[in-house]
């Protein structure tokens, strides 16, 4: 299995759940930008306070904030990692590619988890996060489609993109992911 992975997909697609399973199984570092940002928010850091205002509106946190958090983690860990939730747009992909080039850790495979908007909304409302409500979810899905979708073409052109269906049980989706990554 490849050991430098990137998971793409809309919010609520199960990226975090699947990333945790793959990382536990393979011993990889799981870098979830959403979790990293929530840690900053719960820690009450200056970055966390800025991020909270942005996240509560359903908007994306600035590239500079996110890349600096990711960089700190990757510099300390080079064995195997999975990025979940970053990059979300071509500008972030460029920043990430520059960072990974500097530390000689290029992405080996990008996995796109695809799923229907109605299922996504149900899943997100069921998570119980304070930044998940119907208006915020609708805005997040629109932002995803507008800004993140071009990444599919970007990584497809690089020959490192694989897509899987994210519907079904956690176990079924995990089996599809393992097959795609082998």
Curated annotation (Swiss-Prot):
Enzyme Commission number(s) of this protein: 2.7.4.3
Gene3D superfamilies: P-loop containing nucleotide triphosphate hydrolases
Principal EC category: transferase
Residues binding AMP: 33, 38, 59-61, 85-88, 92, 129, 140
UniProtKB keywords: ATP-binding, Cytoplasm, Kinase, Nucleotide biosynthesis, Nucleotide-binding, Transferase
GO cellular component terms listed in the entry, alphabetical order: cytoplasm
Main localisation: cytoplasm
One GO-annotated biological process of the protein: AMP salvage
Pathway given in the UniProt record: Purine metabolism; AMP biosynthesis via salvage pathway; AMP from ADP: step 1/1
Region annotation (LID) ranges: 126-132
Domain notes: Consists of three domains, a large central CORE domain and two small peripheral domains, NMPbind and LID, which undergo movements during catalysis. The LID domain closes over the site of phosphoryl transfer upon ATP binding. Assembling and dissambling the active center during each catalytic cycle provides an effective means to prevent ATP hydrolysis.
Assembly: Monomer.
Family: Belongs to the adenylate kinase family.
Protein name as it appears in the record: Adenylate kinase
Species, as recorded: Prochlorococcus marinus (strain SARG / CCMP1375 / SS120)
